[in-house]
Curated annotation (Swiss-Prot):
This is D-aminoacyl-tRNA deacylase. It comes from Mannheimia succiniciproducens (strain KCTC 0769BP / MBEL55E). It catalyses: glycyl-tRNA(Ala) + H2O = tRNA(Ala) + glycine + H(+); a D-aminoacyl-tRNA + H2O = a tRNA + a D-alpha-amino acid + H(+). The lineage of its organism: Bacteria, Pseudomonadati, Pseudomonadota, Gammaproteobacteria, Pasteurellales. Pfam families: Tyr_Deacylase. Belongs to the DTD family. Keywords: Cytoplasm, Hydrolase, RNA-binding, tRNA-binding. NCBIfam families: D-aminoacyl-tRNA deacylase (TIGR00256). An aminoacyl-tRNA editing enzyme that deacylates mischarged D-aminoacyl-tRNAs. Also deacylates mischarged glycyl-tRNA(Ala), protecting cells against glycine mischarging by AlaRS. Acts via tRNA-based rather than protein-based catalysis; rejects L-amino acids rather than detecting D-amino acids in the active site. By recycling D-aminoacyl-tRNA to D-amino acids and free tRNA molecules, this enzyme counteracts the toxicity associated with the formation of D-aminoacyl-tRNA entities in vivo and helps enforce protein L-homochirality. GO terms for molecular function: D-tyrosyl-tRNA(Tyr) deacylase activity; Gly-tRNA(Ala) deacylase activity; Ser(Gly)-tRNA(Ala) hydrolase activity; tRNA binding.
Amino acid sequence: MIALIQRVSQAKVDVNGQTVGQIGGGLLVLLGVEKEDSKEKADKLAEKVLNYRIFGDKNDKMNLNVQQTDGELLVVSQFTLAADTGRGLRPSFSKGAPPQLANELYQYFVQKCGEKVRVETGKFAENMQVSLTNDGPVTFWLKV
């Protein structure tokens, strides 16, 4: 399971011209689910995302996590994170989880994060337009 996390001052996701999820300060989480992923991996990744210290303290040192800053999450499914880009000029998605498993684990991840912070989401398997203001920019790729 892969999360591309971006520290944002604001982010939103639109589907068919309608905003379906929007946050102020916090993290935009692009979530990719792979074939071998499980609820245990989702638990580990949720814990890591929620506790990853990428927000500035009073000395502007990355020492605080999203919970400590009263931040929010915008979680957006992104199967392309599971792409194999090692060969050729076209990505292979053979490592990606089947849609039913991917949706189940995506929803589970959202639920786990929602136990600790406010979470907004995109729409699974939809064409989405994501806009954000990356604060920093600060972006990390997390994999469990």
